[in-house]
Amino acid sequence: VSGTALRAGFNDSAITHHLAMLAIMDADGFDSARREIGEYLVGDVQDNLDGQKLFDGSAMPQSKAAINRKGKTLIDHHHLYDSYVYQLVGGGVEVGSALVYAAINHFGGETGRTGHRFTMKARPVMGIGPRQEAALGNFLIAEIRRAQP
């Protein structure tokens, strides 16, 4: 799964102490926050596809195919929509899609068959912006609160 990683650094020693406690806690404790984060990020991607917006809230560039059929971009058959998953890895969580065309849709670039090549606009439906950062921070704060004696 290609995906998104989250890194956070804190100067506050109390928060650092609690994060260290999370790292050495029973795996079930920290796993719940990572699962919540994974489920949130997959849901965020699906909400973005449903709402035809990018991760930053801006409108998704429409494909010619979607315009011609008067439908939605990247969601006609739900293949890409259903392909986004998360998995717990080490001390984090990976979120992404294993579909080859997920990358070209995310980053944009030249694609198509020989003689029919074109430049596809980037449509990053997955990402970490201010809205996602706030939600992820809330999941971690909730986990720290659960770890309190």
Task: Mark where each language-model region is.
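Short, Lys/Arg-rich flexible segments
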Residues: 1-149
